[in-house]
Amino acid sequence: MKLKSLLLCTFIGLSSLAQAETVHVTTAGSLKTLVDTTARVIDDLTLTGSVNRSDLHYLRNHVKKLNLKDVTIAEETVGKVLYPDNVMPDSVFIGDKVLSSIVLPSGIVEIGKCAFNEVRGAAFTVDFSNCKHLQTIRNNAFSESNLQEVNLDGLTALQTIDAYAFYWTDIKRISLEGCSSLIMLGERAFCNNYFVTSVNLKGCTSLQSVGNRAFLNIGKQSKDAGTLDFSETAIESFDESSLQSSWVKTVIFPATLKTISAKALYLSKAANLKFLDDVPPTFGTQWMSDSALKHVNITVPAGKVKAYADAFGLSGADAKNLADANGATLGINRISAATASAQKRYNMAGQRVGNGYRGIVIENGKKVVR
């Protein structure tokens, strides 16, 4: 009995090992002659050499784990459609229900439209780490897939993430750290990613625009997508509804900011906003709901509380959560008129001043702007 069990375990082990295959493709277009996918799913396949769109499409729904790191993608024309070299072809794995892991080719410069759209392999993961020449991720490249994470760290050649590129996936973490050439996040690029818990934009120094609804509904299921820190970016404009209904705790805006468009933060759950430019941006209609604006904690540059209060249209008690980097506020103390006149105030030199003094004063141990 023990011998039978040992033989069975050995057979199972050998069967598992047999499923890991490495194939070198000398001539692009010849994969069919090297790998038989008839009525089978390959657990683990590594390709090397040269392949084209037909080779890759041939593997659709037939491979669980695919390593293309050392593959070169060759140009191919199918009908009247040209599939360029060094580009992950449009729609090549669209609707794949088996693929759960892929290591992308190191030489690609672009991921085509819908390349991995609706890939539903269990816990789908993509390794971008070797893609040092990647410049563009096209429309819907990974949309509506089971993708678990977007880790584009260190991809210094990446310039554009197009519309709907990562729309409605299962991603929990977005990291663009070190994407120093990234210029644009397209319309709905990360929209409806309900499970996100963190977003890393550190080092995205060239980022200029965040598209319409780019982060709409982010973190809706996780209830906390953390902090959206745009401070190192060069963003001048947040498009309409770009952060609408997002479940982020804190948003830090860059010093380059000029415009926050209509409904950019409408229905957002943000509890903290921080602005870095001395000049308030232009705010579009309902950029944030009136009630939320009165309750969110807002930090602005030193000495700029009044300018921002005017830009927000806040005054009196409605501005109680607005303060500058030094803690100075508009002086909303919620005290009676009778006691207000007797309130002791001191300037920054420690000298007592009267009610007519204008500038930063100390009241009740707090800095306020008069």
Regions found by a protein language model. Give the residues of each.
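C-terminal tail/sorting-segment detector
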Residues: L3, I360-R370
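Sec-dependent N-terminal signal peptides
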Residues: S5-L14
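Sec/Tat signal peptide C-region and signal peptidase I cleavage site
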Residues: L14-A20
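Structural signature of tandem-repeat unit edges
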Residues: A20-T26, D43-V51, V63-N86, K97-E110, ...
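Terminal processing/anchoring signals of secreted or surface-associated proteins
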Residues: L45, Y308, G331-I332, G350, ...
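Consensus positions within tandem repeat domains that build extended binding/scaffold surfaces
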Residues: D90-V92, G112-A115, R138-A141, D162-A165, ...
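A recurrent domain-boundary module in secreted/ectodomain proteins
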Residues: A307-G331
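Residue-level detector of functionally pivotal "anchor" positions at catalytic/ligand-binding pockets or at interdomain
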Residues: N326-A349
